């Protein structure tokens, strides 16, 4: 497939336009060249953007793809009528039809989605991130009653990135604990976690993949050996079965897929959108 230039145009930071655009582009096997045009908030800047888009179209002999999130209708009109790209306007596609359906005019405020520094949702996310960092890798057993999710699994099975994703994306207070040889000898989860079993979710991973990941960190060590990884994974999975907790393999799953499964299984009450 021919490499396309993709423009992301916004009268704000452009984060929403880029997130929306990348989610759509991910459905196609292509490596687009990204051009970001944030703060396109005047007619003059819109004309500059049009000239850049049209120059790219002439230079490459193919239409650029243009994703926009423009609240200013005058600016949008300049882009719509002047550019020679394929225009995909997020507000026109989603916001304006919703205005008709809801019979309510949207705020059309620039950067409304991202301007959360004074909101309750922002505060909830910051509190969740602080909690998750304080309870990363079993650093603390305190205040576990305040946790929304407690992840357990062998070292390097994906607990920390999943915890931080849950905190940043959903405002969930996520603790995580590594399962270690002492736990395997006792053949049960860490005692401090047992009162909170309903919040516990286990992560496992194929031993071969675990050994590969650990070798990147500590090459040729017993910790990273395939034999040790097989033993740890086997013990951890047996422990999870005995405890009756829900768990999944992270081997072929993205952080987003892991987090979504956890939300579906545990159904935490406190979610930030």
UniProtKB/Swiss-Prot annotation:
Binding sites annotated in the UniProt record for ADP: 153-160
EC number annotated for this UniProt entry: 2.7.11.33, 2.7.4.28
Catalytic activity: [pyruvate, water dikinase] + ADP = [pyruvate, water dikinase]-phosphate + AMP + H(+); [pyruvate, water dikinase]-phosphate + phosphate + H(+) = [pyruvate, water dikinase] + diphosphate
Record has Transferase as a keyword: yes
Single annotated GO MF: phosphotransferase activity, phosphate group as acceptor
Keywords tagged on the record: Kinase, Nucleotide-binding, Serine/threonine-protein kinase, Transferase
Pfam families per record: Kinase-PPPase
Keyword Nucleus: no
Similarity comment text for this entry: Belongs to the pyruvate, phosphate/water dikinase regulatory protein family. PSRP subfamily.
Role this protein plays: Bifunctional serine/threonine kinase and phosphorylase involved in the regulation of the phosphoenolpyruvate synthase (PEPS) by catalyzing its phosphorylation/dephosphorylation.
Name of protein: Putative phosphoenolpyruvate synthase regulatory protein
Organism: Variovorax paradoxus (strain S110)
Source species taxonomy: Bacteria, Pseudomonadati, Pseudomonadota, Betaproteobacteria, Burkholderiales
